[in-house]
């Protein structure tokens, strides 16, 4: 009885391509938790800044604070409006990611950068207006602003690396 050999090219099957499954835990955290909580946080902050309740603990409340420092009202109204826009941006980004839409990862990166930029603009305006009233920022405040910027940029880099490896999945 002759042995059949699998070395015959006719008997060989093409090698199956193995597609490496990438873990999606960070993705799930983003779409089911982080972006939703970010939107809620932005709306909450927008409410506090638009109503002046952010200064509720000040003597005389918001009215007393704004009477003494009227320029802060304009900054807070701008920041409150930005909070509403950022909340909508977070929700939109979440649904684009969840739907695996083309360009959704780059949209998330734009959201990350926009968040950092809006926060830094607020703090720069706050520092500038404070200086016009003779109040200089403390070293602790400056360090906290630098830390916020650093954390925001680190978060951006993590997302860039994570979604750079998964960009091919977002093709709808």
Where are these regions (language model features)?
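Topology signature of small-to-medium multi-pass alpha-helical membrane proteins
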Residues: 2-172
């Amino acid at each position: 009885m002759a042995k059949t050999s699998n070395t015959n090219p006719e008997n060989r099957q093409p090698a199956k391509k193995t597609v490496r499954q990438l873990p999606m835990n960070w993705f799930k955290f983003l779409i089911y938790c982080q972006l939703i909580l970010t939107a809620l946080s932005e709306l909450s902050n927008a409410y506090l800044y638009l109503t002046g309740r952010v200064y509720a603990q000040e003597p005389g409340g918001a009215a007393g604070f704004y009477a003494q420092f009227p320029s802060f009202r304009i900054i807070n109204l701008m920041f409150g409006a930005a909070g509403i826009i950022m909340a909508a941006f977070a929700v939109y980004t979440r649904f684009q990611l969840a739907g695996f839409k083309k360009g959704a990862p780059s949209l998330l990166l734009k959201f990350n950068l926009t968040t950092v930029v809006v926060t830094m603009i607020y703090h720069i305006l706050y520092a500038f207006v404070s200086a016009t009233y003779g109040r200089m920022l403390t070293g602790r405040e400056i360090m906290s602003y630098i830390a916020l910027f650093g954390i925001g940029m680190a978060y951006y880099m993590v997302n860039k690396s994570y979604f750079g490896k998964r960009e091919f999945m977002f093709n709808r």
